[in-house]
Amino acid sequence: MPKPRLLAEVLVTVLLALWAQAAAAQTKIVVGYTATADFASGFIALDHGLFKRRGLDVEFKLVPLNSQLPAAVQSGSITFGGTTVSVLLQAVDGGLEHVAIAGSGVTWPGQDSFGAVMRADVAYAKPKDFIGKKVGAPGIGAFLHVLFRNWLLDNGVDYKKVTFVEVGFPQMADVLKGGNVDAVVTGEPVMGRIVAGGIGRQVTSFTDNLKSELPIIVYSGTRKWAEANPAAVKAFQDAIAEAAAIANKDQAAVRAAVANYIKMPPEVIAAMKLGRWQAAVTEAGIAGWVDIMQRQDMLRTGIDAKTIIAR
C-alpha cells in the first residue's frame, strides 16, 4: 500500500475518533436511579471519571420509585432511566419507543443481596404464610415485585391473595417498623439496615427457582435519542463495561461508590451483601423476563427481545 494512502487512512481514523468524542462531549446525560446497590457500576463509572474520560457529562438523579422512570425519560426530565427490565417491558408494551442502552446488576443462583423481609413480630415458616399479608414493593411491576410473585407461583401460592403496596426504598424501614406492612421486598443496602436494626428478617431471596441469570437493571432511553446520538451511546456503554469489571473484583470500590449515592450508616454499607454486574444486555436475558411477565399476564403484546436493545 502506498505510504501517502496509509497516512491518509490513519489521519481519517484519528479525525473520526476525535469527532466522535467531541460529539459525545456535547451531550449532557441525566440518569435516573433508585436507592439500590444494583446501580454500583454506574456510580463507579461516575466517581472514577470513566464517563468524563470518554467525553460524557453524566449526572445521576435519585427517583423514589422505579416505576416512575419511563415517564421521566419520556418527558425529557432525564435522559436514561435505570429501569428494571420488567418496568422497561411494560413501557414498551404500552407503546413507548424505549430501548435498553446498557446493563447493570444481574441475578444468579444463590444470590442473597435482595429478598423478602418479614417484620420481626410476624410469624413465617413457609411461602403460603404470605397469603393475607401486605407486602411493600419499590414499584408495582418493577423487578422485586415481579420476581417475588414468580417465586410465589413456583411455590404454589396465588399472588392475588397477597396485597402489594408501593413503598420507596428510603421509607421501607419506617413503614415496616410502624406496622403499615407485614413485609417488604427489598435489596441492599436497605435490606441490611432493616435486618441489622432488628425490624425484620430475610425469609427468602426468591432466586432459588430461577432457571438462568436475569438482568436486574438496564439503563434505558428513547429510541429516538439513541439513534440520534450513537457516539454518546457507545461511550456510555464502554464506560459501564469498564465500571462493571471494577465492581465485580473490587468490593471496596463498590461500597465506597454506593455510600456516595445512597445515604446509609457506614456500618450498614460495610456489612451489605454485594451483587454482580454485567454491562451487556442480552436477548436471552430480556426473553427470560418476557416469559416471567407473560406468566403473570403483564404483557398485552408480543415483544421481540432483539428490537429493544440499542446496538
Give residue spans per PLM region.
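Short, solvent-exposed loop/beta-turn-alpha elements that line the ligand-binding surface or hinge
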Residues: 53, 108-109, 208-211, 276-285, ...
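Bacterial N-terminal signal peptides that target proteins for export
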Residues: 1-11
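Short, glycine-/small- and polar/acidic-enriched structural segments
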Residues: 26-155, 165-166, 182-188, 203, ...
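N-terminal signal peptide c-region/cleavage motif recognized by signal peptidases
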Residues: 19-22
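Pocket-lining segment of extracytoplasmic ligand-binding domains
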Residues: 86-87, 122, 170-257
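Structured segments of extracytoplasmic/periplasmic soluble domains
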Residues: 45-48, 54, 72, 76, ...
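Secondary-structure end/capping motifs
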Residues: 226-298
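Conserved C-terminal helix/tail region of periplasmic/extracytoplasmic solute-binding proteins
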Residues: 294-311
